[in-house]
């Protein structure tokens, strides 16, 4: 069906800029954009449907490119403990931290995980998100990583959102492999990744390169295996220390390296040369009260594309609003509203390997967009929370969330 969406202003985000079109219109044909431009330049179109957007500002659908949406349990009790003076080490020694999430996730059924993840996902969708990446990583064995990835696929098949599934088996060391990190990495490479990829459950492979997780050498083994399986890679890197993980990611042409508070200028140079996107996660920075900022000057100087995401997870960023992350990126990292919006559209699509079809409003791309009742695009980063008045269009069809 061909639809004319008229009477709007557009921030198309082409090339990662606002790329504003005033007094504009969009023609969609099925799920794709057929025409976009000033309404006055549109010849009398043939269309089956005409929708008046009442002067709204239209942006691409938002893309949350780094989340851990599927997990069992709840760690708000630990949050309260930390604020009462209990250290993270004490919480972990008592069986808390990521170990508690792994236990709860392993104990939960697929249906239970789906139900809790669906509730969290609906918050993102109400914020204007039309594409989301979700990681495994709280199962840490084949059976439970498969369970999480199956839930992720199910969410993509049942909810009005495009979902990309990332296998993060190399997230932490499971209890049954205590003090045997090399053995666990071998298990991931020899058993888990080949099986999960063969079942069609994996779109990309991620790992956590950090002193409290896995070394660059161990991560490299995972990357080599991913390459043999023709799967792109991503990396949690330089969140708490500088181990050269982001340069390692660049060497393997990773889609993205994420967190990056402790990355160096040499890392930025390597990422720019490889086209690897820097995914910044202001929610985790805020929640952990970090003080080391990502090197924004180096990222800008060398032209590294910058994306923003919620990092939705139970331990370090229980963030249910991608728009709130826009404000945090501007306030904490001193990004401009234009940079921040590019970070959840154009560059977020690049971070998922989807830039040919998503992330900007251009002819031939997927017709995912949001018509916002706002005065200017910067309002999306300006307002702190709240459900802004909007109309969400996915694949050329208005969606009711």
Swiss-Prot record:
User: Which superkingdom does the taxonomy of this entry point to?
Assistant: Bacteria
Subcellular locations according to the entry: Cytoplasm
Q: Give the residues the record marks as binding 4-imidazolone-5-propanoate.
A: 75, 138, 171, 239, 316
Which residues are Fe(3+)-binding?
66, 68, 236, 311
Give GO BP annotations, semicolon-separated: L-histidine catabolic process to glutamate and formamide; L-histidine catabolic process to glutamate and formate
Keywords, ordered alphabetically: Cytoplasm, Histidine metabolism, Hydrolase, Iron, Metal-binding, Zinc
* Broad class of enzyme this protein falls into: hydrolase
Cofactor(s) needed: Zn(2+); Fe(3+)
**A GO CC term attached to the entry:** cytoplasm
Q: Does the keyword Nuclease apply?
A: no
Q: So what does this thing catalyse?
A: 4-imidazolone-5-propanoate + H2O = N-formimidoyl-L-glutamate
Sites binding Zn(2+) sit at 66, 68, 236, 311
This entry's comment on the bound cofactor is: Binds 1 zinc or iron ion per subunit.
Chain residues that bind N-formimidoyl-L-glutamate: 138, 313, 315
Q: In which pathway does it act?
A: Amino-acid degradation; L-histidine degradation into L-glutamate; N-formimidoyl-L-glutamate from L-histidine: step 3/3
Q: Which InterPro entries match?
A: Amidohydro-rel (IPR006680), HutI (IPR005920), Metal-dep_hydrolase_composite (IPR011059), Metal_Hydrolase (IPR032466)
Q: Which SUPFAM superfamilies match?
A: Composite domain of metallo-dependent hydrolases (SSF51338), Metallo-dependent hydrolases (SSF51556)
Spell out the disulfide connections: none
- Of which family is this protein a member? Belongs to the metallo-dependent hydrolases superfamily. HutI family.
- Function text: Catalyzes the hydrolytic cleavage of the carbon-nitrogen bond in imidazolone-5-propanoate to yield N-formimidoyl-L-glutamate. It is the third step in the universal histidine degradation pathway.
Q: Which NCBIfam families match?
A: hutI
Q: Mind telling me what this protein is named?
A: Imidazolonepropionase
Task: Name its species.
Answer: Pseudomonas syringae pv. syringae (strain B728a)
Gene encoding this polypeptide?
hutI
């Amino acid at each position: 069906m061909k639809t004319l969406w008229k009477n709007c202003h557009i921030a198309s985000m082409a090339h990662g800029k606002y790329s504003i079109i005033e007094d504009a219109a969009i023609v969609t044909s099925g799920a794709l954009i057929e025409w976009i431009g000033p309404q006055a330049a549109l010849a009398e179109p043939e269309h089956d449907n005409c929708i008046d957007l009442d002067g709204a500002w239209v942006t691409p659908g938002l893309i949350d490119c780094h989340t851990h949406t599927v997990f069992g349990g709840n760690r708000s009790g630990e949050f309260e403990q930390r604020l009462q003076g209990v250290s993270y080490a004490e919480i972990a020694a008592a069986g808390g931290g990521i170990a508690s999430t792994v236990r709860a996730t392993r104990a939960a059924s697929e249906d239970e995980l789906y139900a809790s993840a669906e509730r969290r996902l609906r918050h993102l969708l109400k914020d204007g998100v039309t594409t989301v990446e979700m990681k495994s990583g709280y199962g840490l064995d084949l059976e439970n990583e498969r369970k999480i990835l199956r839930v992720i696929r199910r969410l993509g098949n049942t909810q009005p959102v495009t979902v990309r599934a990332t296998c993060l088996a190399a997230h932490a060391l499971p209890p049954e492999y205590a003090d045997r990190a090399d053995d666990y990495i071998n298990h991931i490479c020899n058993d888990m990744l080949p099986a999960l990829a063969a079942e069609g459950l994996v779109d990309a492979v991620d790992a956590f390169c950090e002193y409290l997780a896995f070394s660059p050498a161990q991560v490299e083994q995972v990357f080599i295996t991913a390459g043999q399986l023709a799967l792109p890679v991503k990396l949690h890197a330089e969140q708490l220390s500088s181990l050269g993980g982001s340069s390692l990611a660049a060497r393997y042409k990773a889609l993205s390296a994420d967190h990056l508070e402790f990355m160096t200028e040499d890392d930025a140079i390597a990422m720019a040369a490889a086209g690897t996107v820097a995914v910044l996660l202001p929610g985790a920075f805020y929640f952990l009260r970090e003080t080391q900022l990502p090197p924004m000057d180096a990222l800008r100087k060398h032209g590294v594309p910058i994306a923003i995401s919620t990092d939705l997870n139970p331990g370090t960023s229980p963030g249910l609003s991608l728009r709130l992350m826009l404000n945090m990126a501007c306030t904490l990292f001193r990004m401009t509203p234009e940079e921040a919006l590019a970070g959840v559209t154009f560059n977020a699509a690049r971070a998922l390997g989807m830039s040919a079809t998503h992330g900007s409003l251009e002819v031939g791309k997927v017709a995912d967009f949001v018509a916002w009742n706002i005065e200017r695009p910067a309002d999306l980063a300006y307002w702190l929370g709240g459900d802004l008045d909007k109309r969400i269009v996915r694949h050329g069809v208005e969606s009711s969330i």
